[in-house]
Every structure is written in C-alpha cells, then in structure tokens.
Amino acid sequence: MGGGLIERYVAAMVLSAAGDTLGYFNGKWEFIRDGETIHQQLAQMGDLEAIDVARWRVSDDTVMHLATAEALMEAGQSPDLPRLYSLLAKHYRDCMGDMDGRAPGGACMQNAMLLQPNRADGYRIPFNSHEGGCGAAMRAMCIGLRFPHPSQLDLLIQVSIESGRMTHHHPTGYLGSLASALFTAYAVNGKSPWQWGKGLMEVLPEAKKYITQSGYFVKENLQHWSYFEKEWEKYLELRGILDGNSAPVFPQPFGVKERDQFYIDVSYSGWGGSSGHDAPMIAYDALLAAGDSWKELAHRAFFHGGDSDSTAAIAGCWWGVMYGFKGVNPANYEKLEYRQRLEEAGRALYSLGSKEDPVLDP
C-alpha cells in the first residue's frame, strides 16, 4: 500500500481521471478498435512516461464520476437516502451541460435529462431492456470511498444500484455500478484483489434481495438478472479465482492482440468494456495482472481496442486507492483537467468515509 489513506483517496479520484484522459486521448483512442494500432502510436510518443496530459481532456466518465462524488459531498454526514438520490439526480442532469467533445453515452444523455430531482421519486426511470451499458459502472467508484466500512455494505449496495439505475435501469448496467463501488471499498480495506471476485458473487444475492424489496419493476429486473452473474462466474472460473484463495492464472502469451480478443470474447456485443459487466471485469483483470505497476495497468486497461476510457477510469481509481501515486510520472496527472476538483473530492470523501456514520432511511 502506498502513502497514507488521505493521499490514496486523492489518488483514487485523480488517477481515475488520468486513466480516463489517457484512454480517451481527446476521442482519438476510445474508438480505435485495434489495440496494436494504439500501442504503436503510444510507442511513437515515447510510451506512458512521456505523456503530458496538459492538452488532453477528460471524457464523460470523469464528468459523471465527479457528479457522483460532489453529490455525496453535498449530502454530507448521515444523509437521508431520498435527499442523496435527489442530489445525485440533480448532479447527473446538470453535468450534461459539460459534455461537449467528451463523447457521452446515449443512455446517460437521454435518461439524465428525464430526471426530476425536485420531485419525490423524480430520480426513478422505467426499466429498459437496452440499458446494460457501462455508463453506470464508470461513475460509481467513489461510492466505495464514501461507504467503505463492512457495516455499510447494505448502504453501498443500495446507493450504487439506485445511482446506477437513474440512467441504466437494467441489471447488467446497474450491477456494474455495484461492482465498481464494491471493489473500491475492498481496496480501501486492504482486501486482496484475489478475493474481490468471490466477494462480488457473495454480494449479488443481497443486491437481488434489495431489488425485490424496492418493489420497482421487480419482475423485469429478475428476468434479466442472470447474465451479469453468469458472465462473472465464467470469468472467475477462467482465471481460477472463484474460491477467493488462489492466484489468478493468465494464458501465455497474453499480449496486446490476445487481450483485445479476450476483451471481445467477454463483451456483450463485440466492444470490450462497453457494458456494465465487462467494464469492471476488464479493469479487474488488468489490476490482477499489473500489481503495483502503473505502466502495466495502463497497457492493459487504458490502451486497447475496446471502450478504453471507461475501463481506464475504473482501473485507475482502484489502483490509486491501493498504491497512491507510487511510480506514476507526474506528467500523467499534474496538468489534468479538473485536477483541483478531483483532489477536493478525494479529501472530502476521506473525511466523510472515515466515520461509520448511519444513514437515515425513511
């Protein structure tokens, strides 16, 4: 573990945005479907260490992650959940005004504009069988910074699901939000990444119970529930970590080309990382292989032929919680867009998350 916990909270927010920025490259790399082409261009630039992000913009992922963080900050200590949800809805809707040149996803754009934060239950949208994308997963990591304590697991489940289904009311979408938040909390607690996947599988029945109890489009949600769970179980079996005790096993070779194919194989429609199940999965796969190497994390999670900025935003956050800024060239984040807001969010979330405060549920 690198640095004190405050520094690692700051690194979580900043390096998530750095990953997003690097994977996006002002829109040039997110949509290149061939990872080898990206890696060739990266090598011509002098590789990761040589990149100064001064003129590189964050994408929609970071704008929405900041929206989540700043809603949590505004809700303050011991918030009541309806107010927190209204604040999340407000921040999601408002941040749509900052999407020019950031390639926002369709579901996020359309549904955020439907949210009515000032009305009771105005944060709810109907179920939609086409909303399994990664837009909920890419913005939820900081929920795990806010509610990291094991005693707050039920809260983390509820807040990640409800924040996720404000734009992605489909289990494949909002369970990605749960995975992003849960793994962040695991990182805060120093839980070995080998155990994270097993932990997620144990939490999914609790999430299902919450969906049933919430009484909102229950039948539709349960009908579409199994895909996320089955895909994750298949992945954990493939890496040999379903038991939570074993070291992950990677194929040999597993270079850029092989990883691109693997990311296609785990995807829903052929664009790796673009769904709620595979964006955190690819980020997790990269983290397991990279250990404390920022460069190795980047090569696996930021620079590939899939939805690279989303997998990068998620992986960068988890890695930052674990290792702080250890071995990261300051040029990768010093002149980052919104760096001050990101640092402030990290410090504020540390202050809020360090106390096991109760949350008022009506």
UniProtKB/Swiss-Prot annotation:
Gene3D superfamilies, per database record: ADP-ribosylation/Crystallin J1
Chain intervals for the UniProt region annotation (Substrate): 106-108, 168-170, 268-270, 274-275
Function comment: Specifically acts as an arginine mono-ADP-ribosylhydrolase by mediating the removal of mono-ADP-ribose attached to arginine residues on proteins.
Subunit structure of this chain's protein: Monomer.
The keyword Magnesium appears for this protein: yes
SUPFAM superfamilies: ADP-ribosylglycohydrolase
InterPro entries, per database record: ADP-ribosylarg_hydro, ADP-ribosylglycohydrolase, Ribosyl_crysJ1, Ribosyl_crysJ1_sf
EC annotation from Swiss-Prot or TrEMBL: 3.2.2.19
Family, as annotated: Belongs to the ADP-ribosylglycohydrolase family.
Ligand binding (Mg(2+) 2): D307, D309, S310
Regulation: Synergistically stimulated by magnesium and dithiothreitol (DTT) in vitro.
Protein name in the entry: ADP-ribosylhydrolase ARH1
